[in-house]
Amino acid sequence: MDTTQVTLIHQILAAADERNLPLWIGGGWAIDARLGRVTRKHDDIDLTFPGERRGELEAMVEMLGGRVTEELDYGFLAEIGDELLDCEPAWWADEAYEIAEAPQGSCPEAAEGVIAGRPVRCNSWEAIIWDYFYYADEVPPVDWPTKHIESYRLACTSLGAEKVEVLRAAFRSRYAA
């Protein structure tokens, strides 16, 4: 288990709790949280945050000794120590926060995962799979590193083949060229 990242995740979430700032774990750590176990080494920590509270997240990162390092078309990157944070906003949509363009329910209010004994909010299985569809548009799956192939397999197995195919069809119809 990568105790450095686990410790940092716990620190980030504790600081966010003090500010009543909801954060969702995304990417590979979301898969691990939903499964309740660490499945691999992670290159970064993906976080989803309320878009209108970005300044609070940035201040919190600075308070934890970090800094924003790069602006991206979907959010920003930050570093705390040697750890990379990949931060993406979610926006309030009637009853819940949602990631833009992701399937509804992308940011569940409840803590639906666990990282080293701590309950955590994490992106939905559907949002995780949706991200892999974007990734497949950028990099053919045959060229994916083994860790991404395995994480995608775990996510698909957890969601179920039928639901994955429904999502894939929705993705294709939305982004058909």
From Swiss-Prot:
Bilayer-spanning residue ranges: none
Reported function: Mediates bacterial resistance to kanamycin, gentamicin, dibekacin, sisomicin, neomycin and tobramycin by adenylating the 2''-hydroxyl group of these antibiotics.
Cofactor entry: Mg(2+)
Binding positions for Mg(2+) 1 per the UniProt entry: 44, 46
Species for this entry: Klebsiella pneumoniae
Lineage, opening ranks: Bacteria, Pseudomonadati, Pseudomonadota, Gammaproteobacteria, Enterobacterales
Active-site residue numbers: 86 (proton acceptor)
Catalytic activity: nucleoside triphosphate + gentamicin = diphosphate + 2''-nucleotidylgentamicin
Top enzyme category: transferase
Pfam families registered for this protein in UniProt: Aminoglyc_resit
Assigned keywords, A-Z: Antibiotic resistance, Magnesium, Metal-binding, Nucleotidyltransferase, Plasmid, Transferase
Cofactor binding summary note: Binds 2 Mg(2+).
Protein name (Swiss-Prot/TrEMBL): 2''-aminoglycoside nucleotidyltransferase
